């Protein structure tokens, strides 16, 4: 069914940009506004959204949509769906276009209406998606609850002698056992020096005494993603390992303590980064502090030194400082946080302190 409140927010954003119409084609944005879940692959999927009047869906008859929620124009593989869209748009007014729309559809539309102004207007949808409504918040809490549970299960499952691949496969199987659609990204399990690569892919590295153990994991539940990272040690950590872990955890907590409506996202990055830099590890924190998340694990928006956007209620993003020492080890501690009216809600509840695993 149509998500009228969400659609009204997008329409208001279009009006604010001086637009009266938009083509939405990102499948996740189409679902967000209409409830129609389609993966079009090479075929055309589009939602024509005017600021006044009824929206129009353009669907291939191969798509399994038995009861479309609004006016629908159907096409087959031998039809010309762009010509159908050309009949609906108002060529005398600027047309907002989704950044995801392939050139093979956009260019023929522009050739059909050569005088029509085309404007990139993805932000009108993306900025609305950035602030989750109550339904979305509930779904993301549940995805994070499952992530916490599987993280805890993996923490107790892991033993010295296991490979990264074995443990990552266990985590993915646990997600399926909890009824998830799957992992929200390739599960990261990193032992020892492998953890100094923030995006290491699990391989046949065997866990041994003295290694750090980094899990970066997330699941998709009800179409919404979770994401978290915890770092532990196989055996008692060295003094340096424990100190770096404590530093990263404190950086995570320092940023989270500042979160409330109106704070600039760059201020959160600075709070974590300054702490790590003052301890002498600034050069080894080599990525932004966080990213937005929702139907995908990385949505538009980040928590970085360059982003002066202010936090608004409903935003959900990660806080994930890290220190990565090549050839030695890496530590990252990550939570998802929901901006509330008065502060923030940390969606991940698992302990962030270092612990000994694998025994």
Report the location of each language-model feature.
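Active-site neighborhoods and metal-handling regions in enzymes and metal-associated proteins
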Residues: 1-359
């Amino acid at each position: 069914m149509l998500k009228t409140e969400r659609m009204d927010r997008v329409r208001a954003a279009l009006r604010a940009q001086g637009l009266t119409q938009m083509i939405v084609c990102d499948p996740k944005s189409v679902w967000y506004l209409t409830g129609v879940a389609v993966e079009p692959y090479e075929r055309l999927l589009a939602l024509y959204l005017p600021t006044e009047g009824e929206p129009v869906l353009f669907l291939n008859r191969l798509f399994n949509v038995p009861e479309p929620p609004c006016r629908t124009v159907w096409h087959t593989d031998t039809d010309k769906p762009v010509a159908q869209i050309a009949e609906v748009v108002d060529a005398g007014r600027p047309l907002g276009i989704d950044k995801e729309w392939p050139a093979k559809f956009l260019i023929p539309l522009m050739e059909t209406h050569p005088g029509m102004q085309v404007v990139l207007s993805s932000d009108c949808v993306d900025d609305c998606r950035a602030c989750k409504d109550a339904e979305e918040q509930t779904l993301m809490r549940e995805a994070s609850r499952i992530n916490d549970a599987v993280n805890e299960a993996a923490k107790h499952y892991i033993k010295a002698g296991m490979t990264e691949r074995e443990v990552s496969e266990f985590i993915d199987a646990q997600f399926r056992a909890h009824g998830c659609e799957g992992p929200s990204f390739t599960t990261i399990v990193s032992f020892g020096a492998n953890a100094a690569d923030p995006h290491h892919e699990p391989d046949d590295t065997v866990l041994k005494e003295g290694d750090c153990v980094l899990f970066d994991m997330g699941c998709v539940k009800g179409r919404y993603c979770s994401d978290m990272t915890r770092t532990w040690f196989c055996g008692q950590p060295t003094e340096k390992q424990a100190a770096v872990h404590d530093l990263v955890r404190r950086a995570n907590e320092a940023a989270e303590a500042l979160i409330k409506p109106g704070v600039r996202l760059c201020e959160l990055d600075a709070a974590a980064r300054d702490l790590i830099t003052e301890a002498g590890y600034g050069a080894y924190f080599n990525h932004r502090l966080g990213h937005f998340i929702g139907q995908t694990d990385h949505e538009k928006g980040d928590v970085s030194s360059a982003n002066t956007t202010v936090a608004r209620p409903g935003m959900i993003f990660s806080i994930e400082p890290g220190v990565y020492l090549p050839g030695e080890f890496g530590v990252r501690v990550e939570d998802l946080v929901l901006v509330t009216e008065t502060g923030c809600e940390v969606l991940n509840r698992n302990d962030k302190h270092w612990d000994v695993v694998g025994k």
